[in-house]
């Protein structure tokens, strides 16, 4: 599985849980391929804005996650192919953090790679 690569560099947002970078429209249409099981962004515009941030630094194109030293360095081996922010600013809302906690996903703001905590 892979995420759609953004066609335009304007109006992009990064997932606050896994750092995947996509347009708002893509998050609404497809959800977050790494986090959809816990965030449920697909079809929910308000949740897309709550769980993503337009404030991020740098991007990494992850195409060979298991072979790339950059993906290993950024702990992205278990994520889908796609564009990822190097760092994301923002915090998930308290109700989302509570949901994650009830699912056994520990969330600390500004820490990378939560998505591997709930992968099977």
UniProtKB/Swiss-Prot annotation:
SUBUNIT field: Interacts with spt-5 to form DSIF. DSIF interacts with RNA polymerase II and with the positive transcription elongation factor b complex (P-TEFb complex), which is composed of cdk-9 and cyclin-T (cit-1.1 or cit-1.2).
Family listed: Belongs to the SPT4 family.
Gene3D superfamilies documented for this protein: 3.30.40.210
Keyword Zinc: yes
Function summary: May function as a component of the DRB sensitivity-inducing factor complex (DSIF complex), which regulates transcription elongation by RNA polymerase II. DSIF may enhance transcriptional pausing at sites proximal to the promoter, which may in turn facilitate the assembly of an elongation competent RNA polymerase II complex.
Keyword Phosphoprotein: no
Full protein name: Transcription elongation factor SPT4
Pfam families, alphabetized: Spt4
GO molecular function, one term: RNA polymerase II complex binding
Predominant location category: nucleus
Zinc finger intervals, C4-type: 15-35
One GO BP annotation of this record: regulation of DNA-templated transcription
């Amino acid at each position: 599985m892979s995420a759609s690569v953004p066609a335009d560099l304007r109006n992009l947002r990064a997932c606050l849980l896994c750092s995947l970078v996509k347009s708002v429209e893509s998050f609404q249409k497809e959800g977050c391929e790494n986090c959809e099981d816990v965030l449920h962004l697909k079809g929910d515009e308000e949740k897309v804005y709550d769980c993503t941030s337009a404030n991020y630094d740098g991007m990494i194109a992850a195409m060979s996650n298991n072979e790339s030293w950059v993906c290993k360095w950024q702990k992205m081996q278990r994520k889908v192919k796609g564009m990822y922010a190097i760092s994301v600013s923002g915090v998930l809302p308290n109700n989302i953090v509570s949901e994650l906690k009830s699912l056994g996903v520990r969330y600390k703001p500004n820490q990378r790679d939560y998505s591997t905590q709930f992968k099977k």
